[in-house]
Curated annotation (Swiss-Prot):
It comes from the Eukaryota. This is Beta-toxin NaTx36. The keyword Secreted applies. It comes from Centruroides sculpturatus (Arizona bark scorpion). One of its GO terms (cellular component) is extracellular region. GO terms for biological process: defense response. Expressed by the venom gland. Disulfide bonds join 11-61, 15-36, 22-43, 26-45. CDD domains: neurotoxins_LC_scorpion. Keywords: Disulfide bond, Ion channel impairing toxin, Neurotoxin, Secreted, Toxin.
Length: 63
């Protein structure tokens, strides 16, 4: 599934321009690849497991 990966607290992973950082974070969570989506300032991944993708309806993020 494509989408924003989550940290352990349920929030998205912030970034500014670092595609390598985001790609690493996505692969660590068993995704295929990832990049920094500048407009949302968050990492975006392709091919993540369903339970690793941020969903505002079920998120536990309180940031």
């Amino acid at each position: 599934k494509d989408g924003y990966p989550m940290r352990s607290d349920g929030c998205t992973i912030a970034c500014l321009f670092d595609n390598d950082f985001c790609n690493r974070k996505c692969v660590e969570q068993k995704g295929k690849s990832g990049y920094c989506y500048f407009w949302k300032q968050s990492c975006y991944c392709e091919g993540l497991p369903d339970d690793k993708v941020y969903d505002s309806a079920t998120s536990k993020c309180r940031a």
